[in-house]
């Protein structure tokens, strides 16, 4: 019995009917999210900045947003506020490398529903997504 495969299988969710908008401008982070989310069967939409995220949100039915906060053109805080103005019930999970004191509170004030500090561990990502997508 291969324990590593069992753990990996436990992490894999089946979200074939779900749409996740990933807002990320750093290629290495995009690769992580792509690899992590591919096996969930969720449809993944990509935005490279906050303005593109707001536009994509308006044009698509989205179940959850993974929002980087430090973005070009429009930051993640502003994009979060604009998306929440459109749909207050959409879960938005902040993901940021800024882990200074007060950062979580700043995210929540902007309207984020949860917060992930980079580097993000796969188990924590899946647990957090499950909390919102398995309702």
What are these regions (language model features)?
Residues 24, 48:
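Conserved acidic carboxylate
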Residues 72, 100:
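The feature encodes the CheY-like receiver
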Residues 120-129:
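C-terminal output helix
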């Amino acid at each position: 019995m291969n324990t590593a495969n069992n753990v990996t299988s436990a992490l894999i969710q089946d979200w074939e009917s779900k749409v996740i908008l990933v807002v990320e401008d750093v290629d290495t982070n995009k690769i992580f999210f792509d690899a992590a989310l591919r096996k969930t069967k969720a449809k993944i939409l990509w935005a490279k900045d906050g303005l593109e995220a707001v536009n994509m949100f308006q044009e698509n039915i989205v179940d959850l947003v993974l929002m980087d906060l430090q973005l070009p053109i429009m930051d993640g805080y502003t994009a979060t506020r604009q998306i929440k103005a459109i749909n207050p019930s959409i879960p938005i999970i902040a993901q940021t490398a800024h882990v200074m004191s007060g950062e979580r509170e700043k995210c929540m004030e902007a309207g984020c529903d949860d917060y992930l500090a980079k580097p993000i561990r796969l188990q924590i990502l899946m647990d957090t997504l499950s909390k919102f997508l398995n309702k």
